[in-house]
Amino acid sequence: MKNSSILFVLIIVVFLISSSGNKKMVGEAKKCDQTWTCEGEDKCREKCLTLHNGVGVCDLYTAPLVPKQCFCHYDC
């Protein structure tokens, strides 16, 4: 009896932990992104904030002959 109750509690705890990460709040904004050629870290941040009220970051590493890109992440 004791073993079955411990097993039952363990199963409930595992279920609660695994399902808690899948919940999405009602009305939560969808995440969108947009890219353009990076003209500098400051300009990237400023343009993203102005256009989309988001966060802009330039590439850290790029392939040769490929221009750096500004990645703008914002709520749709």
Swiss-Prot record:
It comes from the Eukaryota. Disulfide bonds join C32-C76, C38-C58, C44-C70, C48-C72. Transmembrane segments: none annotated. Its main location: secreted. Coiled coil: none annotated. GO terms for cellular component: extracellular region. Pfam families: AtDEF-like. The keyword Repeat does not apply. The keyword Disulfide bond applies. InterPro entries: DEFL. One of its GO terms (biological process) is defense response to fungus. Residues 1-21 form the signal peptide. It is found in: Secreted. Keywords: Antimicrobial, Disulfide bond, Fungicide, Plant defense, Secreted, Signal. Belongs to the DEFL family. This is Putative defensin-like protein 184. The gene is LCR18.
